[in-house]
Amino acid sequence: MVARERRARSAAATAVIGEEKVLACYCGASPIAGMKLLPHTRSCFVCGEANPAGLKLRFETDGRIVQTHFVPRAEHVGFRQTVHGGLIATLLDEIMVWACAVQTKRFSFCAELNVRFIGPVRPNEAVVARGELVSNRRDKLFEARAELRNQAGLALATATGKYLPITQAEATDMVTDFIGDPGWVFGAGT
């Protein structure tokens, strides 16, 4: 009964990213064929390699879809073998920020985040987060969507968000924190 209910909830998930409904989970340092690794930062909680409390995730893109692979640890639980919802929301927010950046060549701050939790995320269970830009309103507001799925392809959470582009001064400051080619995100000449 529980498995049937979970499948029904997964099928009812509204955010299907790209054309794939089932994701192959990849948990390594190299991108999946057709995907390119994006730069990362030193300080970010999600992708910062020098942040001792951070997740140290890497993001990859095909130029439209952005994805990352994550295996939550035991210390990420909020309640008995269930990863904290705030961490899941953080991951979905970050993937949408990157999706907006890849498409618009501008980073942004979250103005609104809506998360739908469909099923529990368990520690040590590999998951894939994917996101994409849905609309760009004259470079003043970006709308994106994201999903989190397990290795079996079941949707565990979906999200939508609205994002406000950062200022040029903030972007200039941000570039100094990047590791890798920031031109992939900010455009040539950065």
Regions found by a protein language model. Name each.
Residues 40-41, 53-55, 64-66, 109-113, ...:
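A generic structural signal for short beta-strands and their flanking turns/coil linkers
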Residues 86:
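Active-site region of the double-stranded beta-helix
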Residues 95-133, 141, 160:
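Hydrophobic beta-strand-centered segment that forms part of the acyl-chain substrate-binding groove
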Residues 40-83:
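Catalytic strand-loop segment that frames the active site of acyl-thioester-processing enzymes
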Residues 70-72, 117, 165:
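Hydrophobic residues in beta-strands and at strand termini
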Residues 3-9, 13-35, 121-123, 134-190:
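HotDog/MaoC-like acyl-thioester-processing domains
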Residues 92:
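Conserved active-site segments centered on acidic
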